[in-house]
From Swiss-Prot:
It comes from the Bacteria. This is Probable transcriptional regulatory protein BTH_I1015. One of its GO terms (molecular function) is DNA binding. Belongs to the TACO1 family. NCBIfam families: PRK00110.1, PRK12378.1, YebC/PmpR family DNA-binding transcriptional regulator. InterPro entries: Integrase-like_N, TACO1_YebC-like_2nd/3rd_dom, TACO1_YebC_N, Transcrip_reg_TACO1-like, Transcrip_reg_TACO1-like_dom3, YebC-like. Its main location: cytoplasm. It is found in: Cytoplasm. GO terms for cellular component: cytosol. HAMAP family: Transcrip_reg_TACO1 (MF_00693).
Length: 242
């Protein structure tokens, strides 16, 4: 993608995630509990649980922690009171932001999300105000130097919808979000290990921010990410570090 390095952004994202591993584990435990409660404790027949368990493995969460979270979810001891709520809003320059939460107190969560938006130059929107600007997809990113032809053949055979080579040489593979685990398994069986593999809300268009605007936007995104009830934050803003 012209103007910025998607590969650099992904490396930054991974480094930031590693720095917040304890917080990531907390979020994953909540997601595993809710997924198990809603769809049962067998990851083979529960796609949402499979995704959460795979994420836990990628985050190096001990298997005992995962099993306990599944057991609690199935048993209803925890997770039963968590409610999924999506908030939508805008950052500076009209950048679109989606905030997905799991909460046991809707009043607390909406107040915290609204406060973060307003404190850092954004504002809350109504349901559906920005979600149409994103596609719910499975996304894989492979390092520069990966064989494009071989990856494209394997990806399309696995059921992927699109394979794109970015300006920095990294390769992006997209699939229907429901097919994510199947495509991931097939690619790994073919020897292709993605640096990033996730189900995400991918923006249809991106807005680049530099300088002071980039700093402001990053502060807003960090404030939202750091809220305890927040599971994921998606945006069409691309923060360019100078």
């Amino acid at each position: 993608m012209a103007g910025h390095s998607k590969w650099a952004n992904i490396k930054h994202k991974k480094a930031a995630a590693d720095a917040k591993r304890g917080k990531i584990w907390t979020r994953l435990i909540k997601e595993i509990q809710v997924a198990a409660r809603l769809g049962g404790g067998d990851a083979n027949s529960n796609p949402r649980l499979r995704l959460a368990v795979d994420k836990a493995a990628d985050a190096n969460m001990p298997k005992d922690n995962v099993k306990r979270a599944i057991d609690r979810g199935v048993g209803g001891a925890d997770g039963a009171n968590y409610e999924e709520i999506r908030y939508e809003g805008y950052g500076i320059g009209g950048a679109a932001i989606i905030v997905d939460t799991l909460t046991d107190n809707r009043t607390r969560t909406v107040a915290e999300v609204r406060h973060a938006f307003s404190k850092f130059g954004g504002n809350m929107g109504t349901d559906g105000s920005v979600a149409f600007m994103f596609d719910h997809v499975g996304q894989f990113l492979f390092a520069p130097g990966t064989s494009e032809d071989a990856l494209m053949e394997a990806a399309l055979e696995a059921g992927a919808n699109d394979v794109n080579t970015n300006d920095d040489g990294s390769i992006e593979v997209l699939c229907d979000w429901q097919e994510f685990s199947k495509v991931k398994d097939a690619l790994e069986a073919g020897g292709f290990k993605a640096e990033l593999a996730e189900v995400t809300m991918k923006p249809q268009n991106e807005i680049e921010f530099t300088g002071e605007d980039a700093v402001k936007m990053q502060k807003l995104l960090d404030a939202l990410e750091n809220l305890d009830d927040v599971q994921d934050v998606y945006t069409n803003a691309v923060v360019i570090e100078e």
